[in-house]
Amino acid sequence: MKTLLLTLVVVTIVCLDLGYTRKCLNTPLPLIYTTCPIGQDKCVKMTIKKLPSKYDVIRGCTDICPKSSADVVVVCCDTNKCDK
């Protein structure tokens, strides 16, 4: 009986979201996700225009969505892995 109870507790802990787990991309290419720190509950993708046909892309976690400008397009979202 104790084994069954312990198994149920372990399964419950594994299945429940017990902490902060927002996941966002953290590299220019959409390959590697990272868990955001506490307080940063949005994913951000910033596309920066460097030359007429060249762009840099920055992805990561943020607490406040920055504003877009003429040379920087900012897209924020608040679900896991949404900054592709």
Swiss-Prot record:
UniProt-annotated location(s): Secreted
rRNA-binding keyword on record: no
Keyword Ribosomal protein recorded: no
Primary location: secreted
Parts of the chain that traverse the membrane: none
Reported tissue expression: Expressed by the venom gland.
Signal sequence residues: 1-21
Pfam families the record matches: Toxin_cobra-type (PF21947)
GO MF entries: toxin activity
Role according to the record: Acts as a beta-blocker by binding to beta-1 and beta-2 adrenergic receptors (ADRB1 and ADRB2). It dose-dependently decreases the heart rate (bradycardia), whereas conventional cardiotoxins increases it. At 100 mg/kg, intraperitoneal injection into mice provokes labored breathing, impaired locomotion, lack of response to external stimuli, and death (after 30 minutes).
Family per record: Belongs to the three-finger toxin family. Short-chain subfamily. Aminergic toxin sub-subfamily.
Name of the protein: Beta-cardiotoxin CTX14
Organism expressing this protein natively: Ophiophagus hannah (King cobra)
